[in-house]
Amino acid sequence: MNNVFITGINSNCGKTVITAGIAAVMQSLGYKAGVYKPIQSGAIDKGKYLLSPDLTFVKMLDPYITTHSTYMYTEKTIPYVACKNGNANIDLQDISKDYSILASKTDMLLVESTGGLMTPLNKSIYTYHIPLTLKIPVIFVVTPSNDNVDNYFNAINTAKTAGLDIAGVIINKYPVYADSNEIKSFPTLIENYCDIKVLGLIRSFKGNSVQSNTLISEILNGIDLEDVFRMKIPKLNGY
């Protein structure tokens, strides 16, 4: 099984961009990739249906990527609040069922979280219960800030204590020409202090948008995809 759960620790870390980019790369390499967003808050009301902005971005990169969301709420807040206002309680069995269907149709499925691992989904379950139930490894997306290392350590340690399988960390929005020793040392600090592997570095992009080809190239060159999926990818030898 080559499926992973992608989550963030700090806000605006860009996990949707990373998730979509990895899926687009794998699709371009000839694999059938999927992105599953179990819970989408801030969905767009199109009248007859709700539209997931995150999955729309995925489709913009590659329309052939399989996508799905089980629960969608227009309110842009934590799922626990959104589902109470929307009168739809989040059930891990529903998520597990949809996950199994999607996993059977794809070569690899990237499951993207809403919020962090400790985000409450209802009175008794948190986001970390999703990868725990699905039995898939977790990848953290973080931005380089030594001021937040304590938060990163606490989040990763909490995940380990919960029994989650941690695949590693992807550092997003990393300055290409970092002149700060603190920023330069950030990847090593994460590996040594948090005892977790850095799977890749993705640079900062100017503006709020990124071209598909640019993102695919950045992912190919910046992330160890074989470590992400824990598999050999023969076509990568040609890049």
Language-model features: where?
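Phosphate-binding/switch loop-helix module in NTP-utilizing enzymes
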Residues: 78-121, 128
